């Protein structure tokens, strides 16, 4: 992925950056710079900063794959004010237990759009696929032929479908 990284401190900065990139970009990712998901004051400020016309077309909530079920439910609830429909799951290489994550997201009707594997988030970001998760479940006996017939042929290196 060829990505530029910029920093916005306020709504004017964000508006300028959005206007710069919107016409020529498939995606614009915004990181909340590591604030606690329990910091309601910061979440309120973020809501104000993200108030840029046409910007909230697709908002993804991001969290680590190893996040526990109770914490994940809390994070999803606290950020619900942003109206996100899908999530980005990072650090998928740091766990082999995805059951709680998938269960909580299913209960909340949230889809996994993207995943990352490794410390180089931008370099390892890929579209999430059912095949990737099936291949990475602990103690799951995989029938690759059946999965590939149902979901498509996956790239052996990335797990992404062609």
Tell what function each PLM region has.
Residues 1-14, 18-45, 53, 64:
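Switch II (G3) loop of P-loop NTPases
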Residues 11-13, 34-37, 65-69, 92-96, ...:
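Conserved nucleotide-binding/hydrolysis micro-motifs of P-loop NTPases
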Residues 18, 76, 101-102:
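Generic hydrophobic/aromatic pocket-lining and core-packing "Φ" positions
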Residues 24-25, 47-48, 78-80, 105-107, ...:
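Short, hinge-like loop/turn segments at secondary-structure boundaries
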Residues 37-43, 71-73, 97-100:
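Conserved ATPase-coupling elements of RecA-like P-loop NTPase cores
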Residues 53-67, 71-75:
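Phosphate/Mg2+-binding loops and adjacent switch elements
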Residues 55-63, 80-122:
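Conserved beta-strand/loop subsegment of P-loop NTPase cores
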Residues 105-162:
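NTP-binding/hydrolysis catalytic cores, primarily Walker-type P-loop NTPases
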